[in-house]
A protein has these predicted regions:
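Inter-lobe coupling/hinge segments of SF2-like helicase ATPases
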Residues: 270, 281-599, 663
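Accessory helical-bundle/CTD segments and flexible terminal tails appended to RecA-like ATPase motors
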Residues: 505, 524-534, 541-548, 553-556, ...
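Conserved pre-motif I regulatory segment
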Residues: 9-13, 240-286
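Upstream accessory/linker segments immediately N-terminal to the RecA-like ATPase cores of bacterial MutS
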Residues: 65-256
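Helix-hairpin-helix
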Residues: 1-18, 103
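Short, surface-exposed secondary-structure boundary micro-motifs
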Residues: 58, 111-112, 225, 558, ...
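OB-fold nucleic-acid-binding modules
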Residues: 29-59
Length: 690
C-alpha cells in the first residue's frame, strides 16, 4: 500500500529510530499525550503561565536576524487585532519563509514566552485557517520522536499526519480481534473505533474509551498466554504425590521448632502441602518480607519430601548465601538423622566426588548449592522437591534444567524477599501460584529509618560509636556507580580511611566488587563472626546475609539507590532482639522524586507498599527479574504499574476462557487461539514465553 508522505527516507528513519517496519506497527505507535485544541485565545489573553495555547490571526511581516555565520533567526510578526506576537524559527528557516504568507490567516499553536517585552512562540505549529475548522480539532496527539528524527524534519506533527493518512487509507472497518462475548459485557468499544479515537479523539472521553479498549486487549492476550502455558504445564507434568507426613517433619515440629509459627507461615505450609498431595507438579512463588520466616517454611516442606522417600535441594544465588543456608538448616535439624551437603564451585576434588556419590545413591537427603547444582554431572537418586532462593537471579531455563534431574519434575518452590506488586506478579510470574507470608514473627522491633543530611555526619558518627560500645555491629554502604568502578573504589578507599580515623578504636572489614571472591568471603566472614565491628562496602550487601548482632545500616548518598535497593539493604538489620536503625544520608538538595523515595522509606517498613511505590516511580522495565522471568513483555500502551484494575479484569476474562477450553479445541474460542498464535509469531514479543 502506498502512503502519501512516506518516502524511502522516512521509511528508513522510522525503521532505524522507532523500529517501525509495518503499517500495523505504525498504527500501534500511540501518542504519549494530548492537548485540547478546541479553544482559540486572543493575544491580549496570553500569559507566560499558560501551557500550550492557540491563537488565530494574520502574518504582518517577516524579519531575518543574523548573529554570526551559523546563527540565524526568522521572526514573523503576527496579529489577531488585539495585539502582536512574534513567531520565531531558529531551524527550518527556509521552509517557514517559503511556506507561510503575509496577510494569510493562520491558526498558531505553541507555548507563549516573553522576549524583549513581547510575547513569542518558538517553532509553533501552524495551520491554514481556511482548511482547519475548530470543530475538527479536538484533542491534538503528541508522539515521541528522537533528535535524529527532528533533524530530518520528522517531528510529532509529521507522525500525526502519517497516522491520519494511514487511517484514511485503511478499510472502513478494521477486523475485530476480541469476540462479542468479551467486548459487550465490559462495554468496550470496537477495535476500529479504538484505533481511530486513540490517534484522533475529539474529546477526553473518546481518548479514555480508546485507551481502555487497547490496554485491555494487550493485557488480555498476555494473560491468556500465561494462563494457557500454566494450564498446559499442569496437564503435561504429573507431579510426585506426597501422601504422608512422617518422622522427619514430626520430630522437627515437636522437638526442634525454634519458635511458634505465625498464622501466615501455617497458611503457606497448608497451601504447599495441598500442592504436594495433588499429584500435579507444584510451581509456587513464596513472597515474604525480610525476616518473615520463608526459610523455615521451605525447610518444613523439604522434610515432607524426605518423609515420602525423596531428596530435596535448595539453590541460592551466591556461595555465601548457600553456606548460610547450610548453617541455618544444620542448626534447625540438630539431632535429626538427616544428611545435608553443600555443592558450590569451591567444593572440589575428593569432597565433590563424595557429595555426587551420595546424591546418586540417595544417601544425601538435602543438597544446598548454587548454579553448580544444575551441572550435568549432578545426578539425584530421587529428587522430589526444589527450593529456588531469590528467583530473579535464575532464569526459567535454569529452573527447567532441574526438572531433568528426575523422572517426574520435582515440586518447585520459588522464594523471594523482594516483594512483587500483585499486578506485576500476575504478569511476570503468571505461571506460578503465589503464596505470601504477610506477618513477621512476634516480638521483633520495627526498624527505625532516619533521614540525615551529609552536613550532620558528626552526630551520626557519635550515634554509631554508642551502638558499637553497647556491643552492636554496623554496616556502612557506599553507592555503586556502574559506569565508573574506579571512582567507586577511590570513594570507598578514601571513605574507609576517613572512617578509620573517626573510629580508631574499632575493627573494620571492607568489601568491594573488585575483590577476589575468596577475599570478599573472608572479609564478610569476619563481620559475620563478630571479629570486626564495622563493615564498609561499595557493593550491595548480599540479600539474605544474616548477622543478628548488626543493628545499624548507614547508606551514604542514599539518593542514588532505588526504593527496592534501599529496602533490601535495610533488611540486613533488625534480625536480633535489639532496636535497629537505618540511616539514609543524602545531600541537602534533592529532586522531588528522590525526596518521595526517602519519605516512603521513613514512613513504612512494609515491603509490599514499598514495591508498589517503586513500581509507580520507576515502571516495570527497571525491576530486577522481568527479563529473566521468561515473559519478555514489551507493552505498547498498557502500564502494569498504573493499570492494575485492567490487569485484573484481563486476567479474569482470560481465566474464564482457560476454564471453558483448557485444551484450546472448542470452535467458539478459535478466534482467540488464532489471534494468540499470530501474536506469538510476529515481533509483538509481549506474548512470548520461553
Amino acid at each position: 500500500m502506498y502512503l502519501p508522505g512516506m518516502g524511502p527516507k522516512r521509511k528508513d528513519i522510522l525503521n532505524r529510530e522507532l523500529h517501525i517496519q509495518t503499517w500495523g506497527e505504525l498504527l500501534e505507535y500511540y501518542p504519549y499525550k494530548y492537548v485540547d485544541r478546541s479553544r482559540i485565545y486572543t493575544i491580549v489573553e496570553l500569559s507566560v503561565d499558560m501551557p500550550f495555547v492557540q491563537i488565530k490571526g494574520k502574518i504582518l511581516s517577516f524579519e531575518e536576524f543574523v548573529n554570526g555565520p551559523r546563527r540565524k533567526r526568522l521572526v514573523a510578526h503576527f496579529t489577531d487585532g488585539t495585539g502582536i506576537v512574534d513567531l520565531v524559527w531558529f531551524q527550518g528557516i527556509q521552509y517557514a519563509a517559503k511556506t507561510y504568507k503575509v496577510e494569510r490567516e493562520y491558526i498558531v499553536f505553541g507555548k507563549p514566552t516573553v522576549f524583549n517585552g513581547r510575547y513569542q512562540f518558538a517553532h509553533p505549529d501552524i495551520d491554514d485557517a481556511s482548511t482547519l475548522q475548530l470543530s475538527e480539532m479536538g484533542m491534538q496527539p503528541y508522539y515521541v520522536t528522537t533528535e535524529k528524527m527532528k533533524k530530518a524534519g520528522m517531528q510529532s506533527r509529521a507522525i500525526e499526519r502519517l497516522e491520519k493518512t494511514l487511517l484514511e487509507k485503511l478499510p472502513e472497518t478494521l477486523p475485530e480481534t476480541l469476540p462479542p462475548y468479551i467486548v459487550e459485557p465490559l462495554h468496550l468499544i470496537s477495535r476500529d473505533r479504538a484505533f481511530r479515537q486513540i490517534h484522533y479523539p475529539k474529546t477526553a472521553n473518546e481518548m479514555q474509551q480508546a485507551r481502555l479498549r487497547l490496554k485491555f486487549e494487550e493485557l488480555f492476550y498476555v494473560q491468556l498466554n500465561i494462563l494457557r502455558y500454566a494450564s498446559d504445564h499442569r496437564r503435561k507434568y504429573r507431579g510426585y504425590m506426597f501422601s504422608q507426613v512422617g518422622r522427619f517433619f514430626n520430630t522437627f515440629y515437636t522437638q526442634n521448632l525454634p519458635f511458634q509459627l505465625t498464622n501466615a507461615q501455617k497458611r503457606v505450609i497448608r497451601e504447599i502441602r495441598a500442592d504436594m498431595h495433588s499429584g500435579r507438579q507444584m510451581n509456587r512463588l513464596l513472597q515474604g518480607d525480610v525476616g518473615s520466616g520463608k526459610t523455615l517454611v521451605a525447610l518444613m516442606s523439604m522434610l515432607i519430601a524426605l518423609d515420602n522417600g525423596f531428596q530435596a535441594c535448595i539453590m541460592a544465588p551466591t556461595e555465601i548465601l548457600a553456606e548460610q543456608h547450610l548453617t541455618t538448616i544444620k542448626e534447625f535439624l540438630h539431632g535429626i538423622d538427616v544428611r545435608i551437603e553443600l555443592l558450590t564451585g569451591v567444593v572440589q576434588g575428593k569432597r565433590r566426588q563424595e557429595v555426587l556419590a551420595g546424591l546418586a545413591t540417595g544417601n544425601v537427603h538435602i543438597l544446598v548449592g548454587t548454579h553448580a547444582v544444575i551441572e550435568d554431572t549432578v545426578q539425584f537418586a530421587r529428587l522430589g522437591f526444589v527450593v529456588v532462593d531469590e528467583q530473579h537471579r535464575f532464569g526459567v531455563a535454569q529452573r527447567a534444567k532441574l526438572w531433568s534431574k528426575s523422572d517426574n519434575p520435582p515440586h518447585v518452590l520459588v522464594m523471594t524477599a523482594t516483594p512483587i506488586p500483585r499486578t506485576l506478579a500476575m504478569t511476570i510470574y503468571g505461571d506460578l501460584d503465589v503464596s505470601v507470608i504477610d506477618e513477621l514473627p512476634p516480638g521483633r522491633k520495627p526498624i527505625q529509618t532516619i533521614h540525615k543530611y551529609d552536613t550532620q555526619m558528626a552526630s551520626l558518627y557519635q550515634g554509631i560509636r554508642q551502638q558499637i560500645l553497647q556491643g552492636r555491629q554496623v554496616y556502612i554502604v557506599f553507592p555503586l556507580i556502574k559506569e565508573s568502578e574506579k571512582i567507586d573504589l577511590k570513594n570507598l578507599e578514601e571513605g574507609f580511611e576517613t572512617l578509620r580515623q573517626v573510629f580508631p578504636e574499632f575493627r573494620m572489614s571492607k568489601v568491594h566488587g573488585r575483590m577476589k571472591p575468596k577475599d570478599k568471603e573472608a572479609e564478610m566472614q569476619k563481620f559475620v563472626s563478630g571479629e570486626t565491628q564495622i563493615l564498609v562496602a561499595t557493593t550491595v550487601i548480599e540479600v539474605g546475609v544474616n548477622v543478628p548482632n548488626a543493628s545499624v545500616m548507614v547508606i551514604l548518598d542514599a539518593q542514588r539507590f532505588g526504593l527496592s535497593q534501599l529496602h533490601q539493604l535495610r533488611g540486613r538489620v533488625g534480625r536480633g532482639a535489639d532496636q535497629s536503625y537505618c540511616i539514609l544520608v543524602t545531600s541537602y538538595k534533592l529532586a522531588e522524586e528522590t525526596r518521595k523515595r526517602i519519605d516512603i522509606m521513613c514512613d513504612t517498613n512494609d515491603g509490599f507498599r514499598i514495591a508498589e511505590a517503586d513500581l509507580k516511580l520507576r515502571g516495570p522495565g527497571d525491576l530486577e527479574g522481568t527479563q529473566q522471568s521468561g515473559i519478555a513483555f514489551d507493552l505498547k500502551i498498557a502500564d502494569i504499574a498504573r493499570d492494575g484494575q485492567i490487569v485484573q479484569m484481563a486476567r479474569n476474562e482470560a481465566q474464564k476462557i482457560i476454564d471453558a477450553d483448557p485444551t484450546c479445541e472448542k470452535s467458539e474460542y478459535k478466534m482467540l487461539w488464532n489471534r494468540l498464535k499470530e501474536l506469538r509469531k510476529t515481533n509483538i514479543n509481549w506474548a512470548a514465553i520461553s
